[in-house]
Amino acid sequence: MYKRKTASIVKRDSSAAGTTSSAMMMKVDSAETSVRSQSYESTPVSMDTSPDPPTPIKSPSNSQSQSQPGQQRSVGSLVLLTQKFVDLVKANEGSIDLKAATKILDVQKRRIYDITNVLEGIGLIDKGRHCSLVRWRGGGFNNAKDQENYDLARSRTNHLKMLEDDLDRQLEYAQRNLRYVMQDPSNRSYAYVTRDDLLDIFGDDSVFTIPNYDEEVDIKRNHYELAVSLDNGSAIDIRLVTNQGKSTTNPHDVDGFFDYHRLDTPSPSTSSHSSEDGNAPACAGNVITDEHGYSCNPGMKDEMKLLENELTAKIIFQNYLSGHSLRRFYPDDPNLENPPLLQLNPPQEDFNFALKSDEGICELFDVQCS
């Protein structure tokens, strides 16, 4: 660069002479060419081709490999110190003073406290009133009584585990059998309860039947009003289970805990009579008393009457309606105490009459045979 500046200065100074300037221009061009060639050729010449040892590059792996021996030594020393401390505690009948342990092991007190904190956290040692005194509490049994108690507790635990497994297995079998019984098509026609069943089970308790609702409400001796509604606002069918359509009062209840008015509960056997009875209440779910009030939607009067008529028609025309069977409402048990309907045909017996040994076709069809 310095030669190029000199050449440019020479060029401005020799601008007046024509021949000299042309000669100088040739020299400048030759000088620039030589400078360029030297600049290009100077790079490989100035390089040092002697082989030098490569500079080591520090990497995280190298640093970790260099620090691992130190860490291993520290961890190994900590483990070794812990083993020595545990042996020292066991040698002193399970208790030792940390100050004495520090002097015996010839380590810093901080190292001893680190070990004791970890051992206390996992429940192997226990510190007494004084923090410097520790007592060994785990890792073995000090006497035969502890071993005996352990064996007894272990055997009892195993016995209880066996009982639990047996109960779980029986419960699984019971649930499976119940599921099979409920899924059997022949048993679905008997999946119901009658009014007599509810009265026998609950006795004098007041029972309201609500479809698809399983909840028990305890009504105490206070003024309560029971109101039941659906989230979608549709009508709901609620019946009060009573004896022969009339509510009963507990004779032992002197305060008149349940004093209900007359309530006609439609049933498959009495729906025809209740529909013709003019004294029946307008809403079959209304119960109004002094202590308890129960209300239903007044607009369901027509719907209830329609349901009663449909049920009555199903009972009367059961032989003409396809897909309907009275067994959905009452089982075929002739030994019921108060059967709703008397079954006339077919009879209970397989055969009302039988032929004797000396009778034949004539006696069967009551025909005069010659």
UniProtKB/Swiss-Prot annotation:
Subcellular location: Nucleus
Pfam family membership, one: E2F_TDP
Entry-linked InterPro entries: E2F, E2F-DP_heterodim, E2F_WHTH_DNA-bd_dom, WH-like_DNA-bd_sf, WH_DNA-bd_sf
Keyword Transmembrane tagged: no
Bias type Low complexity, positions: 15-26, 59-73
DNA-binding region (UniProt annotation): 72-137
Protein name, per record: Transcription factor E2F2
Species whose genome carries this gene: Drosophila melanogaster (Fruit fly)
Lineage: Eukaryota, Metazoa, Ecdysozoa, Arthropoda, Hexapoda
Gene encoding the protein: E2f2
